[in-house]
A protein has these predicted regions:
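Feature recognizes metal-dependent phosphohydrolase scaffolds
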Residues: 1-213
Length: 213
């Protein structure tokens, strides 16, 4: 594990905020080149939606991943619930300029990111859960319902990848496992870390050793 690790989440298309944080912590220089050396940047999902600069942030992460590796460092981008939403065609939070672009091109917005595109291919290779050193990273959280599934981290990542480009109905039809992972008690949606324990049945620290890598 590297000496330093910067952990961010939910850029949501806000270039000004995201890029200023990277510069502030010397992850990139003024030309957006990797300057974080052998250290690690972990972004825990949700570049899609709300903001107007989704595409520039994705391309920056795409570029920095290689630059980080060349420098002996690492960039990790994990999937969040909004990656799963947009790629399934749930466009409730997409900024209007992107919807106008899709209309102009006469294709559904999510097709701009399908797995035949370079960024779509890249998104399809992202993990949902990742163990880095002693730290387990996931966008939302882990529920007792999740633990009952008895899935290893690689198995979870495989299931999430298989369902990433399917819509909600297709996920339900594909398998119960895919449907669960993209639903309320799955790793990108579970809210038990911040909401009622009576409803969300949180996982406690003593349960974590049961999560297999």
């Amino acid at each position: 594990q590297a000496g330093k690790m910067l952990i961010l989440s939910d850029p949501h298309g806000n270039w000004e905020c995201f890029s200023s944080i990277l510069k502030k912590w010397n992850v990139v220089d003024q030309e957006y080149r990797w300057t974080f050396g052998k250290n690690q940047l972990v972004v825990i999902g949700d570049v899609f939606d709300r903001g107007k600069d989704v595409l520039p942030i994705y391309w920056l992460l795409y570029k920095l991943e290689k630059e980080a590796a060349d420098a002996g460092g690492q960039l990790v981008f994990l999937l969040g619930n909004h990656e799963g939403m947009v790629l399934a065609g749930d466009l409730r939070y997409v900024k209007s300029k992107y919807l106008h672009l899709a209309d102009t091109l006469h294709i559904p917005y999510q097709e701009l990111w399908n797995k035949q595109t370079e960024l779509g291919r890249w998104l399809g290779t992202r993990n949902t859960m990742q163990l880095i050193g002693d730290n387990l990273f996931v966008h939302a959280g882990l529920s007792l319902n999740f633990l009952d599934k008895n899935k290893s981290i690689p198995e979870v990542n495989k299931i999430m990848s298989e369902g990433l480009f399917l819509n909600k109905q297709e996920r339900k039809a594909a398998s119960d496992e895919i449907a669960f992972m993209y639903a309320t008690y799955g790793p990108v949606w579970y809210r038990g870390m911040v909401h009622s324990a009576d409803r969300y049945h949180p996982l406690y620290p003593e349960d974590l050793p049961k999560v297999s890598d």
